[in-house]
């Protein structure tokens, strides 16, 4: 997404996504492409995207000032999510 100017990574969100076997680099790749983004609740955004290696990721993030985002969680898409994303 061209408007992203940076990511806010800290021990907490890196540890959280690593429990889902996802790396910060994968999240950045998935969001750098052409993800499907939906507005969630409480200022959150839900993004469905793909890494350069083809892995489908679901990411939840919040937008911060200056075009930076803080990832709250990320995981592999379910089969149902992949099917919807491909359409």
Predicted features along the sequence, with ranges:
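Ribonuclease/tRNase effector modules and their secretory precursors
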Residues: 1-87
